[in-house]
């Protein structure tokens, strides 16, 4: 599921109650991060090292 953030900060593609968040994905522990957007429910799910914009990425 690909989400996008509109001008008012909402998203048209995420289910109700979920926010479209920027998060960082690292395929390995190299310190190289790729930034993407996805819905809150999938922010910590996947085969990669993922941190939400409201979580570890803010440190």
Swiss-Prot record:
The compartments listed are:
Secreted
InterPro entries this protein is in? Snake_toxin-like_sf
Task: Output the Gene Ontology cellular-component terms.
Answer: extracellular region
Keywords of this protein's UniProt record, alphabetized? Acetylcholine receptor inhibiting toxin, Disulfide bond, Ion channel impairing toxin, Neurotoxin, Postsynaptic neurotoxin, Secreted, Toxin
Q: Tissue range of expression?
A: Expressed by the venom gland.
UniProt family annotation:
Belongs to the three-finger toxin family. Short-chain subfamily.
**Biological function:** Neurotoxin. Blocks muscular nicotinic acetylcholine receptors (nAChR).
Q: What is this protein called?
A: Frontoxin II
